[in-house]
Amino acid sequence: MPFTEGTTFSLILDCLRYWVMQYHVDGFIVNPYICNPDELAKDPVLAKSKILKKEDGFQNVMRRFLKGDEGMIRDVICQLKNQDTQLYNYIASHNGFTLCDVVSYDGKHNEANGENNLDGPDYNYSWNCGAEGPSRKKAVTELRKHQINNAFFLLLLSQGTPCILAGDEFG
């Protein structure tokens, strides 16, 4: 749920309860810096719900590994073997680059949306595979396809719940 820092715990609790009771939602992803998942799990209405924590560690390590940063093997192994059942693993999310962007851009290019390129994180750990943005070069497009496949391999090989951003499965 996209709650912000100013959201009170009681409002978060009321919203999640509503989704469970009215729409029979059986799980949520929450930012542990905004609300404590353990506190949510104590609520009688939410007790049987799956409450997963959003944490960028897996995303950042895997992106750095995919783009070839040195010294990442140990971190990759630790992330792949992490068995925290409250975490979910992802390489792309609603906040930042899509998987296709990760292999197509070295930096943000959000100038056209009116936010002066200030939206989304500045640290995307991305690599454009030899050409910034869309490319028709066969070597670049093939490398990008391989990198996307590698990302899915790492994601699905990891322990825990994999999360794929809607649309990323199409490349």
Which sequence ranges carry the predicted segments?
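Substrate-binding/active-site clefts of carbohydrate-active enzymes
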Residues: 1-23, 36-40, 44-49
